[in-house]
């Protein structure tokens, strides 16, 4: 079958068979389909859409384009969690130890940060000595011994997705729901877990800017997972403003440890407890109320923090820094960003804050950029707070020559007003195979 005919079929609104999708995807991976042909096909998908069955089949083809991880050497239900990304999104470092402390195996592969969103692997590597590239044997042995390991994603997983994503990024086809869903779920299916909790962030700091868009994406991903025999649920969480106060690698590790010690910010703690509760429900640990009580208990008795330390120790990390934050690498300098007027903060754009932290050296503008683990931002005033002119909004950490550009970027997302804005929900909805439960109405 000719790729030309398949592009034309989708351009005209046709529905692909599985064999046709295999020809397109596998042809692209092995070089028989050119970039310009794949770009044309993906634009046709963007404009014409796909049926749910088509998207499920595309996902399966993409998953099988690389290594399919077999987690069967690890007994019991394995639960994974995936976030669609955001600013200050440090939830994995909190919920993985909570769920593991409750007796559920977590064998998780995570990514690095790119653009305004941070990556779990970068945060972990800010703890001196931490290894995130484990062999499969080491990975399985660690999960079987302590119940928890978080490592970098293997280069061999869903190889079609890597090529397709790079092309989508430069052809204005990133924000296509079937292509986003197949990209995320192909990696999750290939990673081998039995159950998957999706954290679909929504708002200025997220991929999906509206709740309705986020629910549409979540429903499709839940349907794909269910189609492939996995237990899947999705939470729609707010990313108009960052979670917690800290943005940056070692700064976010410190804040995550505070949550595990029972003294973290209220918003971050609550979202993490809800995520952990739903992961425990997916692992058949009990009712939502029972699972919530379990999650709260392992924070209260210190076992979740202890589990986190065990993970870092097993992967070579210096766990002393998790108790004594002064042992982390020190930033070169700090800078106070001051309010320019009196008023309520109506908007504190999460994407702009994330971009400002990248300018300080906490993130990457392009793949392979080095990171300053100590760089970042600590927020003192968030959306809804009243500020006086001259009051500190945030503290920047990094090299002094980067402060001016970062301050300009941060301020471009600030809006002041005379009336306090309504508080946004932390969680908008829960999506399962049985339907959508809205919390914001």
Q: Where do the protein language model's features map onto the residues?
A:
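General beta-strand structural signal in soluble alpha/beta enzymes
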Residues: 106-110, 132-135, 150-153, 197-200, ...
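Glycine/serine-rich anion-binding loops at beta->alpha junctions
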Residues: 77-100, 104-116
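Short, small-residue-enriched loops and turns at beta-alpha junctions
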Residues: 14, 28, 46-49, 85-87, ...
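Well-ordered secondary-structure scaffolds
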Residues: 5, 17, 28, 68-69, ...
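Alpha-helix C-terminal capping segments
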Residues: 47, 93-107, 187-192, 224-228, ...
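A glycine-rich helix N-cap at a beta->alpha junction
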Residues: 123-149, 219-225, 229
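Acidic, glycine/proline-rich low-complexity segments that act as flexible tails and inter-domain linkers
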Residues: 1-88, 307-318, 434, 440-441
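Phosphate/diphosphate-binding glycine-rich loops and adjacent basic-rich segments that engage nucleotide
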Residues: 144-193
């Amino acid at each position: 079958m000719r790729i030309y005919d398949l592009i034309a079929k989708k351009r005209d609104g046709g529905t692909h068979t599985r064999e046709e999708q295999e020809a397109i995807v596998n042809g692209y991976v092995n070089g028989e389909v050119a970039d310009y042909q794949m770009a044309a096909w993906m634009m046709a998908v963007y404009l014409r859409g796909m049926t749910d069955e088509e998207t499920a089949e595309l996902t399966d083809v993409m998953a099988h384009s690389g290594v399919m991880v077999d987690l069967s050497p690890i007994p019991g239900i394995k639960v994974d969690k995936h976030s669609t990304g955001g600013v200050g999104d440090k939830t994995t470092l909190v919920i993985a130890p909570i769920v593991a402390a409750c007796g559920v195996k977590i064998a998780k592969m995570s990514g690095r940060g790119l653009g305004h969103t941070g990556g779990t692997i970068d945060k972990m590597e800010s703890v001196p000595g931490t290894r995130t590239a484990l062999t499969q044997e080491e990975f399985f042995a660690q999960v079987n011994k302590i119940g928890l390991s978080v490592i970098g994603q293997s280069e061999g997983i869903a190889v079609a997705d890597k090529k397709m994503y790079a092309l989508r990024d430069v052809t204005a086809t990133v924000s296509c729901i079937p292509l986003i869903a197949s990209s995320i779920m192909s990696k999750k299916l290939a990673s081998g877990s039995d159950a998957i909790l999706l954290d679909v962030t929504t708002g200025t700091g997220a991929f999906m800017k509206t709740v309705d868009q986020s629910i549409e994406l979540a429903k499709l991903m839940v349907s794909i997972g269910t189609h492939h025999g996995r237990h899947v649920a999705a939470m729609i969480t707010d990313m108009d403003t960052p979670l917690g106060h800290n943005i940056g690698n070692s700064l976010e590790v410190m804040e995550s440890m505070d949550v595990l010690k029972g003294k973290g910010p209220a918003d971050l703690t609550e979202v993490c407890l809800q995520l952990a509760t739903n992961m425990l429900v997916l692992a058949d640990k009990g009712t939502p109320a029972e699972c919530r009580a379990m999650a709260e208990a392992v924070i209260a008795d210190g076992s979740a923090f202890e589990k986190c330390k065990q993970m870092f120790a097993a992967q070579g990390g210096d766990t002393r820094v998790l108790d004594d934050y002064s042992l982390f690498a020190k930033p070169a300098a700090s800078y106070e960003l001051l309010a320019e007027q009196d008023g309520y903060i109506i908007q504190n754009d999460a994407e702009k804050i994330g971009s400002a932290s990248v300018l300080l050296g906490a993130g990457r503008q392009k793949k392979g950029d080095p990171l300053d683990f100590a760089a970042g931002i600590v927020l003192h005033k968030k959306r809804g707070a009243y500020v006086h002119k001259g009051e500190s909004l945030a503290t920047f950490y990094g090299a002094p020559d980067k402060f001016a550009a970062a301050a300009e970027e941060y301020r471009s997302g600030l809006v002041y007003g005379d009336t306090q804005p309504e508080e946004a929900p932390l969680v908008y909805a829960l999506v399962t195979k049985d339907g959508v439960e809205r919390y914001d109405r």
